[in-house]
């Protein structure tokens, strides 16, 4: 039988145990972080109409990508656009909810903050629409010519 490894005294078992426990705790923290994140997505989906619209348009873009057999690079652009718009919508929702907690009344500074956040979503949506149009319009035109 091989001798036990020497790690500087008998305290190595305690150190190893502490290391294992810390990894287990960090794993639970990671699990909880994912649970909180999925809960945030659920909150947006159940309470925000614009979020539902963006998800629906994302599904349409994915279906069009499948139907037209878009390239890997085109998929990367579409996936980035979907993630970008949905993420911006979630950030906008978080900012709006935070502003509502800070001040329920219509305050000029709060209005500006909400308008800027909404503008960020609009910029993301418009730029994503343009990129999607560049990818899909030529394919749609070719398809329509074959009818």
Q: Whereabouts are the PLM-identified features?
A:
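Glycine-biased, low-complexity coil/linker segments
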Residues: 8-9
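Hydrophobic alpha-helical transmembrane segments
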Residues: 13-86, 91, 106, 114, ...
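Transmembrane alpha-helical segments of integral membrane proteins
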Residues: 92-108
């Amino acid at each position: 039988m091989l001798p036990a490894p020497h790690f500087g005294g008998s305290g190595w078992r305690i150190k190893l145990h502490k290391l294992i426990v810390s990894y287990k705790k960090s794993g639970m923290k990671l699990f909880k972080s994912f649970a909180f994140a999925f809960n945030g997505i659920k909150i947006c989906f159940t309470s925000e109409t614009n979020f539902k619209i963006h998800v629906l348009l994302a599904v349409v873009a994915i279906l069009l990508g499948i139907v037209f057999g878009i390239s890997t690079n085109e998929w990367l652009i579409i996936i980035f656009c979907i993630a970008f718009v949905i993420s911006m919508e979630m950030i906008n929702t978080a900012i709006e909810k935070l502003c509502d907690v800070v001040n329920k009344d219509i305050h000029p500074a709060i209005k500006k903050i909400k308008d800027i956040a909404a503008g960020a979503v609009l910029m993301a949506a418009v730029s994503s629409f343009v990129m999607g149009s560049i990818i899909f319009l030529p394919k749609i035109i070719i398809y329509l010519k074959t009818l």
